[in-house]
Design a protein with these regions (language model features):
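Small-residue-rich transmembrane alpha-helices and their cytosolic helix-loop interfaces
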Residues: 71, 75, 102, 153-163
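Helix-loop-helix hairpin linking two adjacent transmembrane segments in secondary transporters
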Residues: 158-189
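Hydrophobic core of transmembrane alpha-helices in multi-pass small-molecule transporters
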Residues: 14, 108, 119-133
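Residue-level signature of mid-helix packing/kink "hotspots" within the transmembrane helices
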Residues: 71-83, 133, 166-167
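Pair of pore-lining "gating" transmembrane helices in MFS-fold secondary transporters
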Residues: 3-46
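Extracellular/periplasmic helix-loop-helix junction of adjacent transmembrane segments
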Residues: 30-79
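Cytoplasmic helix-loop-helix junction between adjacent transmembrane helices
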Residues: 124-162
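Conserved MFS/SLC helix-loop-helix module at the cytosolic interface between two early adjacent transmembrane helices
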Residues: 79-118
Length: 189
């Protein structure tokens, strides 16, 4: 078992999941921020009007639906691109695929953190979902570098990275918001 490679696999999955989940506690504040910034006649204004039809005027329900829509975009694209990145890594190698997609995740997170409009937030989340399809490639790397009797350890490492990412991502997002570290969007505009 190659421990440095497994560490890279762990970090890839962990960073992917933190990037996915860090935004969860920020959705209500982002809804207010981008609605004020872009206005009711914008993309976000149209989305809020559409969600309001389902929520019956309940502001909390609109914020919840907003989080669901924006959050599911990432997950949907991750689902669609997982087999694409898997096939790409079979042809071009696991390492270049992981390096490229991890760089894409970092870029995607920077885009949404500094987004000066809702459209840029959506672009960042979409790019993140596309690049996060690399979790299947990371799992393949773990399987490739572990022998049959050690393969369970490699898969457990993937599970631990997923679990820790889902635990720490929302916590980091919540703390960043409570400490007012998430005013980067306002600084970028």
């Amino acid at each position: 078992m190659k421990k440095p490679t497994l560490l890279i696999v762990f970090l890839t999955v962990f960073i992917d999941v933190v990037g996915f989940s860090i935004i969860f506690p920020l959705f209500p504040a982002m809804l207010d921020y981008y609605l004020k910034l872009d206005g009711k006649e914008s993309l976000i204004g149209s989305l809020v009007a559409w969600l309001d039809q389902f929520a019956g005027g309940d502001t909390n329900a609109v914020a919840t639906l907003f989080g669901g829509v924006v959050g599911s975009l990432y997950g949907f694209l991750q689902f669609v691109f997982a087999p694409i990145w898997g096939a790409y890594s079979d042809r071009h190698g696991r390492r270049p695929t992981l390096i490229f997609t991890l760089g894409g995740i970092v870029l995607a997170n920077l885009i949404w953190v500094f987004a000066g409009s809702f459209a840029l937030l959506v672009l960042g989340r979409a790019l993140g979902g596309i690049m996060a399809g690399n979790i299947s490639t990371a799992s393949a790397v773990a399987a490739d570098i572990t022998s049959g009797k050690n393969r369970a350890s490699g898969m457990i490492l993937i599970g631990v990275a997923l679990g820790l990412g889902f635990i720490l991502g929302p916590a980091i997002g919540g703390f960043a918001y409570s400490w007012q570290l998430v005013e980067a969007g306002e600084a970028a505009t």
